[in-house]
Each structure stands twice: as structure tokens, then as C-alpha cells.
């Protein structure tokens, strides 16, 4: 019985992101669930900047309130706390925080810190035990988590077509901490964005899925101005940052296969030097869920920058920004406890480009023991 339960449970965990959220309150149309995990995590690598303890905790809640028969209010908050630093260091941050309204079959609208619509498709390959999902990053225009997202979603196409979902999204400007481009939540140029719009559409049928997403954001003056505001500009200058992505997945019969291809313009970060004028990003993953709780994983990820331009006085054309094979496995003891190993086999060469951009070229082995609820 335990084996059969695990075989049914694990795919649900991967989708939900939480093993079994603890129901704190459910009465009179109001519901509040608490979820979280503690990951006792250690990296082994020749790169001393990541080698060692990486332990962290995540905690969040999801709430709903029934306003009328047709209208439901909801909200979600998730926080991460690093467990590998001294107590006087402030290494914690909000991952998501948003509130919204759902109008039955009409759709839902929410606002806050959330995931960009591009992640509706690229998330299909972001399922590795520890690594993965790094041909993009957080606060990277509309490619992953970010601030100021206003999102409309329709599930099952207004209730008319099962499995057909679409979303339309707007992101407000998150600019500089000072000067003309200042906003109340100003940040470094690599994590800024101007006003942006995006959309996604996905279709799932009997385990098969196909999806596409696009986004276009204005770039800020800081992003087009320079590394030190006086001399060299960041690479990847342009009025807009654009992303076009497509993906496929299969999730049935204990098999999970997914792949996504994304082409970006002035949107993919090149280490700490700016953005690629054009980048081609590819991720593919294959996993199998054994009935006794073991889930091996194999993946390949590559991000190739095109026509990068001049960096530190050197002219670079086409360079790999990221390229690795990932081999890993997770073992689920039950719905709340798991352990994993994840080996990132870095295929990048240590050369002048990677040194200029501050890109890691070393392999990493991650070992983790996870309690989640």
C-alpha cells in the first residue's frame, strides 16, 4: 500500500510544490493553509564561493475567502530564510506576495510579487532536485519572480475547453534607487525593469502539454547607461527586453519529459556584465518515478549569447553563458520526507570570457535532506 501511495503522491508534490499543506482554518467560506520546507543542503565544488553549507527554509501560506457564490478572494505569501549564515546577517527575502479575486469561469485577477507569465512554460523544466531553471532568473524582466505583476488568468478557456489556459500580464517599472529613474523600490540595474506586458497559452491533454509565452519590457536608463555610470555601458543595449518561448511536456505513466526553447533580446543576463543582445536558451529534462519512491533525473541546459559585443576592451561574438548536464535522483520516504543528490556537470571552459563575466565553470554536487509540509 505504501508503495502505491508514493507512486500517486510524488507527481502531485512536484506540481504543488508542497507535500501536504497544513490546513490551519476552514470555516464559513474562509480557508487558510500553511506550507513550507527545511532543506539541509550541502554543496561540494572547487568553486569556493558556493562550496559548503547551503541550508535554507521556506515558509508560506495560501488563503481563500468565499465572497459570493460567484466570487472568491485569495492570497499567497512565501518567504525564504537562509540557514547557512550568522545570526547577525539578514539573509532572508519574500519570494511571492500577492492577492486576487476569482470570478468563477470568467477568470482571476491578482497583483503583487509573483511569477512572470514566461514561467508558465519554462517551469516545466524547472523540476530538477536542486539545480535547473537557470537560463533565466528572478527579477529578470518577466521571466520568473518579480515585483509589480498584475495578472489575469483564464482556466479551461472560460470553462469551455478543458486543459486550455491562457494569461495576460502587466509589470510596472522597478527602477533605480536614485536619480531620474528612481522608484520607491529601487535596485541595481541588473534587476531593474521598465513597464512590460506578456502573455502565455498552454494546453494539456491526457498527459501531453504544449505551451508558448511572450513578453516585452521597456529597459531602464541605468540598464542602457553603464557599469559605473561614467565609462563603459552594459552590454546588451536596447529600448526593449523581449522573450519568446515554447515548450512541450509529457507527464503520465510514471514518466516525465519536458523541453523548452527560449529566444531573448536584451533580456538574458551575461554574468555581471549586462545582457546578451540575443540569446538562445534550451532546457530538457527526463525523469521516471519508481513505485518505491526513487525518482532519477537527467537534464541538459544551455544558454548561448549571440553578438555579445565589447567586454573589458575585448570583442566577443557568440559565447556559451551556461551549459551543463545534470544527473540526479530524489528518494521520497513519505509525503513529508525526502533526500536527494544532484550533480551539475559544467561544460563551460575556464577562459577569458567566463572570467570577465564572473561565470562559474566548476562542477557542483548537491546533497540534501528535506522535510516539507
Swiss-Prot record:
GO terms for cellular component: cell outer membrane; pore complex. GO terms for biological process: monoatomic ion transmembrane transport. The chain crosses the membrane at residues 34-42, 54-63, 74-84, 92-101, 107-115, 142-154, 164-171, 197-203, 208-215, 244-250, 255-262, 272-288, 294-301, 325-332, 337-344, 365-372. Residues 116-133 are annotated as: Loop L3. Disruption phenotype: No effect on propagation of phage Sf6. Upon infection with phage Sf6, single deletion mutant has a wild-type level of small plaques with no change in bacterial survival; double ompA-ompC deletions have about 10-fold fewer plaques, survive infection considerably better than wild-type, are infected more slowly and have fewer extracellular vesicles associated with mature bacteriophage. Keywords: Cell outer membrane, Host-virus interaction, Ion transport, Membrane, Porin, Signal, Transmembrane, Transmembrane beta strand, Transport, Virulence. It is a multi-pass membrane protein. Residues 1-21 form the signal peptide. It is found in: Cell outer membrane; Extracellular vesicle. GO terms for molecular function: porin activity. Its main location: membrane. It comes from the Bacteria. InterPro entries: Gram-neg_bact_OMP, Porin_dom_sf, Porin_gammaproteobac, Porin_Gram-ve, Porin_Gram-ve_CS. Coiled coil: none annotated. Belongs to the Gram-negative porin family. Forms pores that allow passive diffusion of small molecules across the outer membrane. Homotrimer. Forms mixed heterotrimers with OmpF and with PhoE; other mixed heterotrimers are also probable. (Microbial infection) Upon infection with phage Sf6 associates with the mature bacteriophage capsid. Was originally suggested to be within the bacteriophage capsid. This has been disproven. This is Outer membrane protein C. It comes from Shigella flexneri.
Amino acid at each position: 500500500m505504501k508503495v502505491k501511495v508514493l507512486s500517486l503522491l510524488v507527481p502531485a508534490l512536484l506540481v504543488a510544490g508542497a507535500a501536504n499543506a497544513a490546513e490551519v482554518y476552514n470555516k464559513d467560506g474562509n480557508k487558510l493553509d500553511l506550507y513550507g520546507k527545511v532543506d539541509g543542503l550541502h554543496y561540494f565544488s572547487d568553486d569556493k564561493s558556493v562550496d559548503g553549507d547551503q541550508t535554507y527554509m521556506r515558509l508560506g501560506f495560501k488563503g481563500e475567502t468565499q465572497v459570493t457564490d460567484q466570487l472568491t478572494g485569495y492570497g499567497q505569501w512565501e518567504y525564504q530564510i537562509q540557514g547557512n549564515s550568522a545570526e547577525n546577517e539578514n539573509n532572508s527575502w519574500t519570494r511571492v506576495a500577492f492577492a486576487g479575486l476569482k470570478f468563477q469561469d470568467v477568470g482571476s485577477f491578482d497583483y503583487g510579487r509573483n511569477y512572470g507569465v514566461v514561467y508558465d512554460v519554462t517551469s516545466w523544466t524547472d523540476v530538477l532536485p536542486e539545480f535547473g531553471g537557470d537560463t533565466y532568473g528572478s527579477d529578470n524582466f518577466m521571466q520568473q519572480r518579480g515585483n509589480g505583476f498584475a495578472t489575469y488568468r483564464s482556466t479551461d478557456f472560460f470553462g469551455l475547453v478543458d486543459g486550455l489556459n491562457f494569461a495576460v500580464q502587466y509589470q510596472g517599472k522597478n527602477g533605480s534607487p536614485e536619480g531620474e529613474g528612481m522608484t520607491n523600490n529601487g535596485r541595481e540595474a541588473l534587476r531593474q525593469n521598465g513597464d512590460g506586458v506578456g502573455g502565455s497559452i498552454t494546453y494539456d491533454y491526457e498527459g501531453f502539454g504544449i505551451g508558448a509565452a511572450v513578453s516585452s519590457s521597456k529597459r531602464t536608463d541605468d540598464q542602457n547607461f553603464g557599469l559605473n555610470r561614467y565609462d563603459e555601458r552594459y552590454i546588451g543595449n536596447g529600448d526593449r527586453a523581449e522573450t519568446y518561448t515554447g515548450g512541450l511536456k509529457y507527464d503520465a505513466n510514471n514518466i516525465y519529459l519536458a523541453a523548452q526553447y527560449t529566444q531573448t533580446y536584451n533580456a538574458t543576463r551575461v554574468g555581471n556584465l549586462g545582457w546578451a543582445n540575443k540569446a538562445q536558451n534550451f532546457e530538457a529534462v527526463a525523469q521516471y518515478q519508481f513505485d518505491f519512491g526513487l525518482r532519477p533525473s537527467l537534464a541538459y541546459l544551455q544558454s548561448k549569447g549571440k553578438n555579445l559585443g565589447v567586454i573589458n576592451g575585448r570583442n566577443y561574438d557568440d559565447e556559451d553563458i551556461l551549459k551543463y548536464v545534470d544527473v540526479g535522483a530524489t528518494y521520497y520516504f513519505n509525503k513529508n520526507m525526502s533526500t536527494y543528490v544532484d550533480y551539475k556537470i559544467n561544460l563551460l571552459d575556464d577562459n577569458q570570457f567566463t572570467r570577465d563575466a564572473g561565470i562559474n565553470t566548476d562542477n557542483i554536487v548537491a546533497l540534501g535532506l528535506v522535510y516539507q509540509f
